[in-house]
């Protein structure tokens, strides 16, 4: 299992469009084979910055998602709303405390 973090900066007047679309597709993303967890965060100081935080079984699962029709549809819509190039990291969890 690993964590995928994606940072996105949106045009301020496009934030609501992004949130509406995310609401419509979030369960499809979460239920994609290999996805264990999905969260969306908004920066406290800059409302144009959002992060997705997702857990994936393995890199193959993430690649299957990234090559899926679902991803293509979501990403094509979402990237038109950006005000800056997105950034993404695949990371291994080292320590987790609850």
Question: Can you say where each PLM-predicted feature lies in the sequence?
Answer:
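Short alpha-helical segments used as structural interaction elements across diverse proteins
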Residues: 1-4, 23, 63, 76, ...
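Short, well-ordered beta-strand segments in beta-rich or mixed alpha/beta enzyme
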Residues: 2-9, 39-66
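Non-catalytic surface loops within mature trypsin-like serine protease
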Residues: 10-12, 58, 92-95
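Short amphipathic alpha-helical segments
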Residues: 12-37, 70-75
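Intrinsically disordered, low-complexity acidic/polar segments
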Residues: 15-17, 49, 61, 97
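Short conserved AdoMet
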Residues: 30-33, 57, 83
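Glycine-rich beta-strand-turn "strand-cap" elements at beta-sheet edges
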Residues: 39-46, 76-98
